[in-house]
Amino acid sequence: MLRNRDYARGRAQVESYGSAPVIMYEPLSGRHGNFFDPAYSAIAVNPDWMRRFDKVHAQAARSLPLPQIDSTRRWRELDSSMSSDALLMNVFCTPEVAKSAAIRSALGVEDSAEPIFGWKARVPLTNGRFDRTEVDMRLGSLLVEAKLTEVGFQTRTAAIVEAYRDFDTVFDHDRLPRAEIATSRWMRASEFPENASQEFESIVADPAVVSNVDTIFRPPGEPGYAAYQLIRSVLAAYAADCSFCVIHDERRPDLREEWFQIMAAVKSAALSVRLKILTWQELAAHLPEPLQGFLDVKYGIVSPGKLPSAIGASAELAD
């Protein structure tokens, strides 16, 4: 947060409310504080890319002040300093990056197609329909999931995950990480029905030990799966005959471990070799120097063997 706060100085932005604030940037005079200038210029003239700004920030009404420049403008997800989609577009919308032979080699992509952001995968379900899966990016035959600061890869109930047509074909169920999905709020003991609260009767009935403390419980949840986003994306890659890569920050080994768990549960060797992992730091080594400087100052992302610049070094990028 300190790095983002320093980078934000002199740019059109506000800070969210709460104990874990984020910086929200506004567009101004053809520039956007959350974006590398050449990337944003390329986005602005590409209607498909610009359409990504249609996604309104879901928490804006209760967690964000009004924009400073245009108070009628609604905050977008891509305005957030914590947006992994913004980071992804900063990299791949910068001219010549997606066509770079070094980048294609790092990603294992042979064709030089234009990036598609928010690609609709239409993963088939057992009922003959398709889900509304949106993959962060498709680059030729490669699907990409981008991560920055997100907590994890979400969880879903078993009923939802097992409703995908190819779930049994692709995965060994027993090797997938499980999770209990909460289906109701935490409850106090006094709210439980008679047959569920009898264990407290011996205490409650004794005035000598009665207490004002009302024990809190969470009723059992539904069985589910962890890393749902990864499971879904692997199924999308299988259905579309694509490869799939997770790009994450090397400072997040927890995300890497989650991905390894999912890869280990894939049955097919032919599909397994199409599943990849890459860090932003590894990718940075192949990027143009000006973009590397932007990633360093704004995100603290530098190529392997280098140290991030000191906080306070952002003045040279301000204009």
Features from the language model and the residues they span:
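Conserved catalytic cores of phosphodiester-cleaving nucleases, focusing on short active-site segments
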Residues: 137-150, 209-212, 233
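Nuclease-adjacent, charged terminal/linker segments that flank catalytic cores
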Residues: 1-127, 309-319
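Short, well-structured alpha-helical interface segments that form or flank functional binding sites
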Residues: 82, 86, 90, 129-132, ...
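Acidic, metal/cofactor-coordinating or nucleic-acid-engaging core segments within structured domains
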Residues: 157-239, 243-244
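Non-catalytic C-terminal interaction segments of nucleic acid-processing enzymes
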Residues: 201-205, 212-213, 219-319
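Short catalytic/ligand-binding loop motif for oxyanion handling, primarily in non-cytosolic enzymes
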Residues: 151-155, 253-256
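Active-site metal-binding core of divalent-cation-utilizing nuclease and nuclease-like domains
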Residues: 113-140, 150, 186-193, 222-225
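Short, flexible loop/turn elements at secondary-structure junctions
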Residues: 93-95, 123-125, 139-141, 147-150, ...
